[in-house]
Amino acid sequence: MSSSFSSDASQYQAENTVNKLFSNILHTNISTTKSTTNANQLFAQHGSSVKKNKKNEAKRIKKNEERTKAFNKFVKYNYIKNKENKNESDKKYLSKLVRKNVNKLNSSSKIDDFEINEEFNIVSSELLDQIKPKNGKRLRKKLFRVNENDERAKEFNEKLQKGVISYPGLTPGLAPVDYNESDSE
């Protein structure tokens, strides 16, 4: 038997109206065996399921797009990485990828707890000290050379003041070209 109603809600509303009419005419109580959902509730239920379906479909599509993007990026990275000759755009892409990944790591590795952060800093500094090469001899040589240079600089300045050595650009006994005595007073 085909129904002449356009939706379940309109059929329910019509049946409910007829039942109320008969109960008023026959002076009987309306049977309460059926649930008491009205047309608006049925519309809302139907609409919410459609909204949920659309929302779920949108989530599924977005997830698929993200997977596709990630896969394409992975393929591009592997292609560029395995290339023998990398051109300028490939190098730029790789450096951009490195910066992006470093930023992700830095943003995700922030520690909120002060004590844990302090302990992490101590452990990382100990590891860096162990990994760092020992530069004892060279450092001593560099420091020794710096002291030698200081002696040389002192000797040079003394000779300049005595007038033994002339410095390029200055004439002994004369003031520089742009020198004003009124400026120094």
UniProtKB/Swiss-Prot annotation:
Subcellular location field: Nucleus, Nucleolus
Naturally occurring in which organism (per UniProt): Candida tropicalis (strain ATCC MYA-3404 / T1) (Yeast)
InterPro entries: Rrt14
Alphabetic keyword roster: Nucleus, Transcription, Transcription regulation
Record function comment: Involved in ribosome biogenesis, probably through modulation of rDNA transcription.
Family the UniProt entry places it in: Belongs to the RRT14 family.
Presence of the UniProt keyword Transcription regulation in the record: yes
The protein's name: Regulator of rDNA transcription 14
Any one annotated GO CC term: nucleolus
Domain of life: Eukaryota
